[in-house]
């Protein structure tokens, strides 16, 4: 199915010259002079090579048809990451290349969307928000309330996020998986 380049989003799968690529990032640029362009960073599914492309925003790109289904994360071992389809209980092993940087979000039982093409896993869509626990934060400096001040914090999964001053070690927070930003204090 042909789509215009400006409509490409992270996780989309495109077909270029018979090869499939997963979109990692897509940004639209509108220079003051000249034609608007879409800068797309992609990963070739066959060998994991990262590629950068630049298209005019109105240019047509072939979007591949993929099967997308819900899976639950089970565990990780030397083979890869194991997921189970909750209805049929079919299990699938996904390579670390496909999981990518999202591995830090995976927790046992987490529901994700797994995209497949010809029964081969090509990309994973994680929930937009996940709950993590803070292991350590820097102390708050009194008197810095004139502007919104955030402080760095380390999470149990190894991520560093910026959090408001009232968040301390042991607090569970919700973060956005796309930009690793603090959303709110967990309500549990």
UniProtKB/Swiss-Prot annotation:
Its main location: cytoplasm. It is found in: Cytoplasm. Pathway: Protein biosynthesis; polypeptide chain elongation. GO terms for cellular component: cytoplasm. One of its GO terms (molecular function) is translation elongation factor activity. InterPro entries: Elong-fact-P_C (IPR015365), NA-bd_OB-fold (IPR012340), Rib_uL2_dom2 (IPR014722), Transl_elong_fac_P/YeiP (IPR020599), Transl_elong_KOW-like (IPR013185), Transl_elong_P/YeiP_cen (IPR001059), Transl_elong_P/YeiP_CS (IPR013852), Transl_elongation_fac_P (IPR011768). Keywords: Cytoplasm, Elongation factor, Protein biosynthesis. It comes from the Bacteria. CDD domains: S1_EF-P_repeat_1, S1_EF-P_repeat_2. SUPFAM superfamilies: Nucleic acid-binding proteins (SSF50249), Translation proteins SH3-like domain (SSF50104). GO terms for biological process: peptide biosynthetic process. Belongs to the elongation factor P family. NCBIfam families: efp, PRK00529.1. Involved in peptide bond synthesis. Stimulates efficient translation and peptide-bond synthesis on native or reconstituted 70S ribosomes in vitro. Probably functions indirectly by altering the affinity of the ribosome for aminoacyl-tRNA, thus increasing their reactivity as acceptors for peptidyl transferase. HAMAP family: EF_P. This is Elongation factor P. It comes from Cereibacter sphaeroides (strain KD131 / KCTC 12085) (Rhodobacter sphaeroides).
């Amino acid at each position: 199915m042909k789509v215009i380049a400006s409509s490409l989003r992270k996780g989309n799968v495109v077909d270029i010259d018979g090869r499939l690529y997963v979109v990692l990032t897509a940004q639209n640029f509108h220079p003051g002079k000249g034609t608007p362009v879409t800068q797309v960073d992609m990963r070739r599914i066959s060998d994991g090579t990262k590629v950068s492309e630049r298209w005019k925003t109105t240019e047509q790109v072939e979007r591949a048809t993929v099967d997308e289904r819900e899976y639950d994360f089970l565990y990780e071992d030397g083979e890869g990451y194991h997921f189970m389809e909750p209805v049929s209980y079919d299990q699938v092993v996904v390579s670390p290349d496909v999981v990518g940087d999202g591995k830090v979000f995976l927790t046992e039982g987490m529901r994700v969307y797994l995209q497949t093409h010809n029964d081969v896993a090509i990309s994973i869509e994680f929930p937009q928000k996940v709950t993590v626990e803070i292991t350590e934060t820097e102390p708050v400096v009194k008197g810095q309330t004139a502007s919104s001040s955030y402080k760095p914090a380390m999470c149990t999964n190894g991520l560093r996020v910026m959090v408001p001053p009232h968040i301390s070690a042991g607090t569970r927070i919700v973060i956005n998986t796309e930009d690793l930003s603090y959303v709110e204090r967990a309500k549990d």
